Amino acid sequence: MDVRFYPAAAGDPAGLDFAQCLGYYGYSKLGNNNYMNMAEANNAFFAASEQTFHTPSLGDEEFEIPPITPPPESDPTLGMPDVLLPFQTLSDPLPSQGNEFTPQFPPQSLDLPSITISRNLVEQDGVLHSNGLHMDQSHTQVSQYRQDPSLVMRSIVHMTDAARSGIMPPAQLTTINQSQLSAQLGLNLGGASVPHTSPSPPASKSATPSPSSSINEEDADETNRAVGEKRTAPDSGKKPKTPKKKKKKDPNEPQKPVSAYALFFRDTQAAIKGQNPNATFGEVSKIVASMWDSLGEEQKQVYKRKTEAAKKEYLKALAAYRASLVSKAAAESAEAQTIRSVQQTLASTNLTSSLLLNTSLSQHGTVPASPQTLPQSLPRSIAPKPLTMRLPMSQIVTSVTIAANMPSNIGAPLISSMGTTMVGSVSSTQVSPSVQTQQHQLQLQQQQQQQQQQMQQMQHQQLQQHQMHQQIQQQMQQQHFQHHMQQHLQQQQQQHLQQQISQQQLQQQLQQHLQLQQQLQHMQHQSQPSPRQHSPVTSQITSPIPAIGSPQPASQQHQPQIQSQTQTQVLPQVSIF
């Protein structure tokens, strides 16, 4: 709670009556300009007292300051029975625990904030003693103000109305800050701060308070509404989630190839639909799956080969598509660079022409302060942009804006310093149409040159693209040729292996045949007759031998025939390989 006192002029007498004493603290340098005045309706707000209040060291002066008493309960205008304003008396500094009364008096020539009182002094319960005086302040009165803050507001408003109507004398008005009063009384207006405007400074010339400082029940209702709106504001602040937009596919992009099963499904779907027109997609897919499972590996390989061929074509098309995208990006970047270069050249020409004019003007001094107008016979030529152009006599013609207040004695030295013929007289201020046409023609020529350069760049880019396509095609052809050569080499290697295997088989057959011949020869050696013995038994036995051995030549003849046949069978087989 801040109670502000404003001292009067220096040299006031020490002995003052009550009105003068209160006027000393209630008046400022400019007179009665207090705000948020509190008064009583019956002019009995303050009561004189015999006790004196000793201020801190301001000399030997002593001032009588009466205590501030609450309004009587019998006031019919307030309409608030059993309610007392909890204002305490201003007493000497008390040595209480942590409750310090620290007055601060400014110099008499300045309006600075003065006395500051601790909050605990206002909220203390019990009896406050001050030089023999005491005032009872019960806990129930403070709790009533905390429970019903609107009554406090009504009392304050009523007191300000009474002060306006002139019931109280101006010497009995005291300034009290409204926000600090409500904070020290422990008011809780629905969890929100009471909106109030800053009071008028003490230097104002009117003694009546501002109407914005009065607070009533409607202000409290408005604060409650504002709190409700603030609570609902975060809910409404939530932004709805925007769905992500899908990127549109480029129609020129090649489509991915389909699998072998998808190709088989396309081929068989129409036939199944023709046989079963009422079949659903799920039933058709089941039938196709069963048919795919029942297919042989050779039939499946046919569809797989088709998919592989489609994949190769897709890779080729994708490479070409990406190359085209790269070329387009390069073309766009080249166009942007050309546009930037043109803009930079135009800006540089404008800067150079303006710099030439500025340097020439700075060399010949500043323009005098007194404005001088050109003769009426000299017309003004205004050009939007300064341009430099080459004339046959190597003269630089720049567009100059001649103002009405420019002195006429600048033209000759400016022309002599630049070494060029500039527009300064009747004949030179007006640009001839031939010069304008020449400028226009130069601009057209520049534009044509730029277009030609752009066309050349585009053609060069197209050639590069064509070369890139050719290189890609050559690479693909080389890869295809290499693949074909690898397949051919593999086939040749397989054939060579087969030949080697067949030769090994023939060699094995020959070895077997030789072994058979050796076995036959061995058998023949074993079958040959042993030497004859001179005995009757041998004669008897040998007699039938010729009969038995007679068929041996036939068997020997048969063996060469078998050998000749086997040789004739082996020779044609060897000739084949």
UniProtKB/Swiss-Prot annotation:
Tissue specificity annotation: Expressed in the cortex and cerebellum.
Give GO BP annotations, semicolon-separated: apoptotic process; calcium-mediated signaling; negative regulation of neuron apoptotic process; positive regulation of DNA-templated transcription; positive regulation of transcription by RNA polymerase II; regulation of apoptotic process; regulation of transcription by RNA polymerase II
Major location (coarse)? nucleus
Compositionally skewed regions (Basic residues) per UniProt: 239-249
Disulphide connectivity of cysteines: none
Q: Where in the cell is it found?
A: Nucleus
Q: Which Pfam families match?
A: HMG_box
Biased-composition ranges, Low complexity, are 203-214, 470-480, 518-528, 550-577
Provide the transmembrane region boundaries: none
Region feature Disordered, mapped onto this chain: 188-258, 470-490, 518-577
Question: Do you know which InterPro entries this protein is assigned to?
Answer: HMG_box_dom, HMG_box_dom_sf, TOX_HMG-box_domain
UniProt feature, compositional bias: Polar residues: 529-543
Q: Is Transcription among the key words of this record?
A: yes
> Which terms in the GO cellular component ontology are assigned?
nucleus
Q: Which UniProt keywords apply?
A: Activator, Apoptosis, DNA-binding, Nucleus, Transcription, Transcription regulation
Extent of Basic and acidic residues compositional bias: 222-238
| GO terms for MF | chromatin binding; chromatin DNA binding; phosphoprotein binding; protein homodimerization activity; transcription coactivator activity
Q: Indicate the residues that the entry says bind DNA.
A: 254-322
Function description: Transcriptional coactivator of the p300/CBP-mediated transcription complex. Activates transactivation through cAMP response element (CRE) sites. Protects against cell death by inducing antiapoptotic and repressing pro-apoptotic transcripts. Stimulates transcription from the estrogen-responsive or BCL-2 promoters. Required for depolarization-induced transcription activation of the C-FOS promoter in neurons. Associates with chromatin to the estrogen-responsive C3 promoter region.
What does the record note on quaternary structure? Homodimer. Interacts (via HGM box) with CITED1 (via C-terminus); the interaction increases estrogen-response element (ERE)-dependent transcription and protection against cell death. Interacts with CREB1 (phosphorylated form). Interacts with CREB1; the interaction is not depolarization dependent. Interacts with CREBBP (via C-terminus).
Q: What is known of its domains?
A: The C-terminus is required for calcium responsiveness but not for transactivation activity. The N-terminus is absolutely necessary for transactivation activity.
Designated name of the protein: TOX high mobility group box family member 3
What gene makes this protein? Tox3
